Amino acid sequence: MEVHWVCMSAATLLVCYIFGSKFVRNLNGWYYDVKLRRKEHPLPPGDMGWPLIGDLLSFIKDFSSGHPDSFINNLVLKYGRSGIYKTHLFGNPSIIVCEPQMCRRVLTDDVNFKLGYPKSIKELARCRPMIDVSNAEHRLFRRLITSPIVGHKALAMYLERLEEIVINSLEELSSMKHPVELLKEMKKVSFKAIVHVFMGSSNQDIIKKIGSSFTDLYNGMFSIPINVPGFTFHKALEARKKLAKIVQPVVDERRLMIENGPQEGSQRKDLIDILLEVKDENGRKLEDEDISDLLIGLLFAGHESTATSLMWSITYLTQHPHILKKAKEEQEEITRTRFSSQKQLSLKEIKQMVYLSQVIDETLRCANIAFATFREATADVNINGYIIPKGWRVLIWARAIHMDSEYYPNPEEFNPSRWDDYNAKAGTFLPFGAGSRLCPGADLAKLEISIFLHYFLRNYRLERINPECHVTSLPVSKPTDNCLAKVIKVSCA
């Protein structure tokens, strides 16, 4: 009798738990359905997740387990291939768009959509002169501050120094007796390059100080925004304060140099020079805090993604010997046909690297360094009969498009030759976004990667220590050992 009573009680508790969990799980969805019931159009299909945390746990589970595509695939399996879904991520009700035309529409509509990053990213990468301004001001600032990195003439000025950084870095890596974390080393290379481009500095002390703080800053980008000691977000905020203190003396020194007049032998203007001179539409110069914000934001954006792309391009080439062989032959042909008096790369030669360019594009497609781009609706918007409510975040989920067999046959396969005579349809290739906020550093990033791969392919090879290492995609796609490997010199070509 007692056993029967215990079994009945346990069964009752189990049923109550299941129905109770389901009830609580649906509260978020019911709340927004009721709140928006008077709107002309319905919300897209989807899952709003648990109260307060939304669907964040599922996102973290899928992206940290090495199966990031499961998050979108589960939505497609449950709600069909609509290309637009509702969810609740990073503390905000959100709409995911993962169909090319819809993605392009959101990215190119500056009237109804603005930048809409999660709170953690907003706080850590704040950049008022580029975010909290009108579209006209944004275009002005963008044109001015990106002038050092846009156009062949501008990029040509960095070739010699970038080559020097790459050659010295590869030589140093190959001389190390112990394995290195390739991702960390690529961050060092990329950071040296971007500091030179934006700040005109080769000061190793500054580079080291800034680089160490950026690691903590980056780790907090998708963290829970709790500013309490012990939390990742708090550590990231402290790192940002350190960065501001490091950058400010550099700005002060440059301001003094400008006030004292042009120096003998001074050449191009770098980003600091431009930021100290630029004025807004009311004729006001930027505050020091704004200059610091812009420098930190651009330095961050300009090296993290490039370094990760570099690491993956080397990894993919190493995993596919036939692709590596073809890429190497192209680079050797370029050096074989140059004039004997020419010792360095030229932009003309980089333009001739057709197959290497395909390797880079395929790396960007497969690695999906940024899984999504963030926007916020500034008005109620109707897309395909569904409403995107004003104030909701919009996640342009490029990863889902890049890994969709409808646009890329055998999407899991690393195949640079897929780009032969291939014209990507609008919205199907979005590694740098689209529209007026298209990443201005795209050409610079490709230039850095091309130079590095040129010298790596000709003279070095990679020997991974854990080739089957687990891959996590949180916050970006990378092996959990940061690609522990040896860089081995194989030639003196």
Curated annotation (Swiss-Prot):
Please tell me in which tissues this protein is expressed: Expressed in roots and stolons. Not detected in leaves and stems.
Under Enzyme Commission nomenclature, its number is 1.14.14.152
Biotechnological and industrial applications of this entry: Saccharomyces cerevisiae expressing Glycyrrhiza uralensis CYP88D6 and CYP72A154, combined with the expression of Arabidopsis thaliana beta-amyrin synthase (beta-AS) and NADPH-cytochrome P450 reductase 1 (ATR1), accumulates glycyrrhetinic acid (GA) and, to lower levels, beta-amyrin; these GA production was increased in the presence of G.uralensis cytochrome b5 (GuCYB5).
Annotated Pfam families = p450 (PF00067)
List the InterPro entries hit by this protein, alphabetically: Cyt_P450, Cyt_P450_CS, Cyt_P450_E_grp-I, Cyt_P450_sf
For membrane topology, the record states:
Single-pass membrane protein
Transmembrane stretches, start-end: 7-23
One Gene Ontology cellular component annotation held by this UniProt entry: membrane
Q: Looking at the keywords, is Transmembrane present? A: yes
Instruction: Write down what this protein is called.
Output: Beta-amyrin 11-oxidase
Q: Which gene encodes it?
A: CYP88D6
